[in-house]
Amino acid sequence: MSALKPLDFQEATANRILELYQQKQYRVLLADEVGLGKTIIASAVIQKVADLHAAWDDHFKVVYICSNINIANQNCRKLGIPEEDCLDFQESRLSMQHLRIYESAGRDHSYMQLIPMTPATSFSMTGGQGSKHERALIYAVLHRYPVFESYQDPLKQLLQYEHTLQWWDWNIDEYNKRIDECDAETGNYLSDMMDAISRYFKLEPAFLDEILDICKQPEVMELPHRRRREAVNGLRRMFASISLDRLKPDLVIMDEFQRFKDLIAGDNSESGMLARKFLIEDNDVKVLLLSATPYKPYSTLEELSETGEGHYQEFMQVMDFLMNDDQKKHQFHQVWSDYSRHLAEIKTEHYTVLVAEKTRAEDEMYRCVCRTERLSDAIFDRSKATEMTEITTEDIRSYTELQMLMDSLSLGKFPIEYVKSAPYLLSFMNYRVKDKIVDALEKQGDYRLVEQSTSMLLRRTRINRYEKIPCNNGRLQTLFNEAFSRERNGAELLLWIPASRPYYSTKSVFDKNKGYSKTLVFSSWEMVPRMIAGLTSYEAERLTVGRLGNREDAKQMRYFAQDSSEGERKRRKVVVRLRDEMEEVLTYPCRTLAKLYEPLELADRSVDEVRRIVCGRVQELLQEFRQTHQLHAVRQSAAQVVALMQTLDGEEPSYELKGIAAGTEKLLTELAIGSPAICAYRLFKGASMAGTMAMDLADKFIALFNKQESMAIIDVLYGNKDSDEAYYWNVASYCVEGNLQAVLDEYAFTLGGGSDLELLRQMKSSFVDTASIQIETRESFLGHREKSRLRTHFAVGYFNAQVNEKTMQRTENIRSAFNSPFRPFVLATTSIGQEGLDFHNYCRKIMHWNLPSNPIDLEQREGRINRYLCHAIRQNLADSEFGAFPFEKSVWKETMDRATVALKQNHSDLIPYWCLPDDFPFKYKIERIVPMYPYSQDRCRYDHLMDVLSVYRLTLGQPRQEELFETIHKENWNMDELKKLYINLSPWNRAHHNGGTEHED
């Protein structure tokens, strides 16, 4: 797996970091603005430092420490870390890394070894008992230590804890095999581990005595829970310490730790152990911190009064760590103090002096910090941020009915923010206020207000009949307007985002939705993502599946399968319409048909013209084929189509070819242009296993088109609801009209350069299974039946849940799917934990359901989609002169090359890959959507956030930022003059603007 190549400003930053290391400045902060590719720079730094060490070091070791396993796996490819070295959730614990380190070293790493790690930052080594995998590995190593030869069973019981014996033994066997293989490969794993254990026990003899005493007890499992837990945690700490000692890195990269003070404060956490080892004890190890916000970038006066600490204290703490030298620290504090004093007295008449002081402070900071920013925001459309959400009768009723219930139960005021954030609150919320309501109702026994309410709870009966569920919430209605294009263009009929540069025009639902984008929603409340996922997906299903029910067979069509008629229930459970030979029609990558359609040769035509030309070629092919094979006309069947394609390729057919049915030319034309397998074959045609890879990817499309919601879409568009034989033909037509080849080619371009197999893996990971969320309905709340579940497919929720292997994998699957052209089209999330994750490939709409309290949090949210080659960049360039046909080989590479030549001029590569010039004729922009109610405080809060964002960079490292902001505001400064006071730490900008302070624009 190769790392991605850095662009010019990234290369300049990597060179600067290397220069600092050579000057013995071993601690460097890379604080590029969110979304500018800090990981790519880190990869370049790795290579440069490795080349530097090659003169005296025969093995270069890099430890990449990431705060989040999803971020780690996302960034492995960018760093060039082999897939086999990337982390599984179950093995991400620090105490398990000793085995991974030796396994990795045993592979053919030649000179350089990269070791990814994700410490459980919220997990204290003094609490819990660790994971079953963690304890199994400890036993698999420790039972080989001579002291425990006579205590195998009690040691196993101690570490088994409360895990099922059958699976416990299986886990131990698996690790025993890996240990034996690792020892055979390296020759020294077990001997090194035994030596390390001996050293530890010599330093902690009382701990060894305690473990042995436990093992001597007749019934280990009967010992007090606390004693066993403390013993297990002691063993975990021991193996974590051994892992740390075995790392011995030449370079440590710490990625996306948002608060440096939290990183170094953890006494017993895995992060704390790592921090002490690499940030405090080993002063000579090279450390690169990657974080746009290692300190709170902006503190309000309210935050300062609450905590006593804020931006200034955190900023100085980071700078003191980076300097790591008393003389350097003293010099920085003195220079920064002078700068702060002049800035606090900011006056237009003192401008020249202030610029000089700023330059001195900037130069001092540049000794250990690099930061590039993109200050141009021309690609942002903020018009929807000021649009007011209409207050409806239903909004008011949602509040009044809940407040009446609260009054009747003497429970005080119902939180108005909850009502503004979600409808049907008792269906979705799991907060304390609901518990109070439930408890009070159970005691009182009077449920009349709940029974009479139309807004507190969803009704299962209405959902089951696919009735329209009123939004009852202005914010949800705003989202529906965006996601479903106000029901004008049929966005609910899309299974993938229309190609930014289609190869031909159609009059289909895809052309009607040209420019359509996914929507990312941020909320402060955990209930909101679940509500959005459930109700938005239901609405999409109502507009498709429900439409079929309205058209025919309405009495049988039900949302909940168990309530459907017998025939409908069997149909849903058993029938997948693409199966057997009907599936093979769309999964066979016919090489002969692939040659009949070359997208760039027939580009920029109507689909009818493309079909006519390709159909002519198919007719010529079949005419010649009939003459040589003496075939007769037969009835159309999928088996005959598969046999014909295989015979055309010179392959042994899977079915006997009896003849060619009338109309086969039209079907083969559709397949040549849009078959998932044939489109995938064209994508992979340079690979040695192109056919196999194409079939592999096409299988994912079969699963997609066999989903209930997909089948409904095809039936709504093409009819033939009950004809499975016609279904595969309709699917092929849908793929043609959806410009599937252009969609796959664009998607491949966004995924970057890796190998064909890596591209296939990433594309396959972009299809996510339909999941469901549990909700309370009126019927379940009143005790009439169990809770119900809403399917989520058009929209999904991404929110804090119990962190385990299953939820982490689901989270990663959702991220991959949202970053693909395929569903889901709406992702709703809480802000927490999303730092560093990309959501930009097909999303240019961001909706702030609730405004954050800090202006920088808003910038961080939007950095999820304002990134390299984001959807808005591609859509604009594709629709410009740079995306005009003809092209020679690659639409997207040539589009970017044309744009670079015309637009870059004296700018860095931020243009055109991240930004476009202010005078670019934008047709598509990143849309900031803030659904605010009229007369609410949200408008004032939003205006203040915008004011602060415009100049907060000027308050960097200042003790009372909000007061300074007010001072600047009153002076009525010219914005161009203020920008010259911004701290410039960009190596590219400083080199290309003679050390001045001009920023990339």
Segments from the language model and where they lie:
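Conserved glycine(s) of the Walker
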Residues: G35-K38
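Helicase-associated low-complexity regulatory tails and linkers flanking the ATPase motor
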Residues: M1-Q25, I40, A44-L827, S831-D1001
